[in-house]
From Swiss-Prot:
Predominant location category: membrane
Co-factor(s): heme
Species, as recorded: Candida maltosa
InterPro entries noted in UniProt: Cyt_P450, Cyt_P450_CS, Cyt_P450_E_CYP52_ascomycetes, Cyt_P450_E_CYP52_fungi, Cyt_P450_E_grp-II, Cyt_P450_sf
Record lineage: Eukaryota, Fungi, Dikarya, Ascomycota, Saccharomycotina
The EC number(s) this enzyme carries: 1.14.14.-
Stated name of the protein: Cytochrome P450 52A3-B
Entry's induction text: By alkanes.
GO cellular component: membrane
UniProt signal peptide: none
Function per UniProt: Together with an NADPH cytochrome P450 the enzyme system catalyzes the terminal hydroxylation as the first step in the assimilation of alkanes and fatty acids.
């Protein structure tokens, strides 16, 4: 066949739109691949192993992740997956162009969060979270984040001591709810989530939604707060969808059902009610509110009167102040109920410091005196080690950069991270690495925190993140959890776990909690 005839037959296909589109896409992907290879060579980088089940386009890998999340098994799926990669890192690509590096290496986590902080940002998190959380400290980067942090930092610097006294009325209601079960099995986690929404709304808004009040107690819940009865459930549902949007990466926009939009509206309705109430208050009313006890919203109103800013920051703090503390309390009591020796040892320390039962000296419990309870601190450290509030997180590269190690056959080479790529770090697995925590890394053992091996963990223990974006409210959460556990230890001598599954399935939204609830009996 003559060359002219071949050209004559092929040429019409070369001018078709789909051929041009395919050629352009192929050229684009090839140019990206060649560019990345060039910089890998120039920077003496090597890729870690490729994620075996991701496939070339990465979609199968994302589907597996979402399935595991929906089944309550994402944390353990990640744990088991990293066991297949001895150098603690691997990577995948999505749609042939987005590189995702997954790591549990403390040195890589340190680079992302601290030493190379300016090389990474939240990436698409704002788009993922915007429908519920808007422009707040957890969704913003750059100057917006710096402004938010500067605005919020003072709110957590001056509140700790008075905070424990404000908890006691809510603890009393919590205890009444527990005692209603008369030693029978009940879901303690469900009560903790109601408890923390009550304490968080009082701290943030100046009024509690009193979700622990119900007909069983003979105390009717308040009905003067619009949207109060729907708030907690709507907040939970919205976070479920936000998590799915996050794990969907660039396909987040596909998760936007009517239920999600309706729940966001319900959450915003309650927040707007409190914001408008604060903005409508006179200066004398604001001053009077402050005298009656610290109120986050009324302090924030002194800095800005923008209702959108107030709403967004309040909801951002609500995620941290409510969900992380509820998860920490739930997992701590889950393990304490399974380990009576640990529970009894903890009660002995609390008896020495504050008394038990009818001899409990509640007035002596404060921010300062709680810090003296070393075993209580070890119990919380161990809970956060095994069940970190945010077990999986990610950052996006703002420029071409590298991670210090994990590449190549021996895992010692740096990894090239192109601009726009994501680094997913899984502290849930980091906290279980044998080289840092020993052969019993999967065992709940608070005593490890008195051993020399845990004094130099560095970035192998990051329950509250690290670097410039370290959690502002970590001491606030630890103080609240310490107070609640202390008071429960004073009131209940015997705990018994009724959960049959171990390790437990874990629900990961924006934070982590027990997937099925924490079922115990308490006497």
């Amino acid at each position: 066949m003559a060359i002219e005839q071949i050209i004559e037959e092929v040429l019409p296909y070369l001018t078709k739109w789909y051929t041009i589109l395919f050629g352009a896409a192929f050229t684009y992907f090839l140019s990206i691949a060649l560019r990345n290879k060039y910089y890998e060579y120039k920077l003496k980088c090597e890729n870690p192993p490729y994620f075996k089940t991701a496939g070339f386009v990465g979609i199968p890998g994302l589907i597996d992740v979402i399935k595991a999340k929906n089944a309550g098994k994402l944390a353990d799926y990640a744990d088991q997956t990293f066991d297949e990669y001895p150098h603690h890192s691997f990577y995948m690509t999505v749609a042939g162009m987005l590189k995702i590096v997954l790591t549990v290496d403390p040195e890589n986590i340190k680079a992302v969060l601290a030493t190379q902080f300016n090389d990474f940002a939240l990436g698409a998190r704002h788009a993922h979270f915007d429908p519920l959380l808007g422009d707040g400290i957890f969704t913003l980067d750059g100057e917006g984040w710096k402004h938010s942090r500067a605005m919020l930092r003072p709110q957590f610097a001056r509140e700790q001591i008075a905070h424990v006294k404000a908890l006691e009325p809510h603890v009393q209601v919590l205890a009444k709810q527990i005692k209603l079960n008369k030693g029978e099995t009940f879901d303690l986690q469900e009560l903790f989530f109601r408890f923390t929404v009550d304490t968080a709304t009082e701290f943030l808004f100046g009024e509690s939604v009193h979700s622990l009040y119900d007909e069983k107690l003979g105390v009717p819940p308040p009905n003067n707060i619009p949207g109060r009865e729907n708030f907690a459930k709507a907040f939970n549902t919205s976070q479920h969808y936000l998590a799915t949007r996050t794990y969907s990466q660039m396909f987040y926009f596909l998760t936007n059902p009517k239920e999600f939009r309706d729940c966001n509206a319900k959450v915003h309705k309650l927040a707007q009610y409190f914001v408008n109430k604060a903005l409508d208050a006179s200066e004398d009313e604001v001053a009077e509110k402050s005298k009656g006890g610290y109120v986050f919203l009324y302090e924030l109103v002194k800095q800005t009167r923008d209702p959108k800013v107030l709403q967004d920051q309040l909801l951002n703090i609500m995620v941290a102040g409510r969900d992380t503390t509820a998860g920490l309390l739930s997992f701590a009591m889950f393990e304490l109920a399974r380990n009576p020796k640990i529970w009894n040892k903890l009660r002995e320390e609390i008896e020495v410091n504050f008394g038990l039962g009818e001899e409990a000296r509640v007035d002596e419990i404060s921010f300062e005196t709680l810090k003296k309870c070393e075993y209580l601190k070890a119990v919380l450290n161990e809970t956060l080690r095994m069940y970190p509030s945010v077990p999986v997180n990610f950052r996006t590269a703002t420029r071409d950069t590298t991670l210090p190690r994990g590449g190549g056959k021996d895992g010692t080479s740096p990894i090239f991270v192109p601009k726009g790529s994501s680094v997913v770090y899984t502290v849930y697995k980091t906290h279980r690495l044998e080289e840092y925590y020993g052969k019993d890394a999967y065992e709940f053992r608070p005593e490890r925190w008195f051993e020399p091996s845990t004094r130099k963990l560095g970035w192998a223990y990051v329950p509250f993140n690290g670097g410039p974006r370290i959690c502002l409210g970590q001491q606030f959460a630890l103080t609240e959890a310490s107070y609640v556990i202390t008071r429960l230890a004073q009131m209940f001598e015997h705990l018994e776990s009724k959960d049959e599954t171990y390790p437990p399935n874990k629900c990961i939204h924006l934070t982590m909690n027990h997937n099925e609830g924490v079922f115990i009996s308490a006497k």
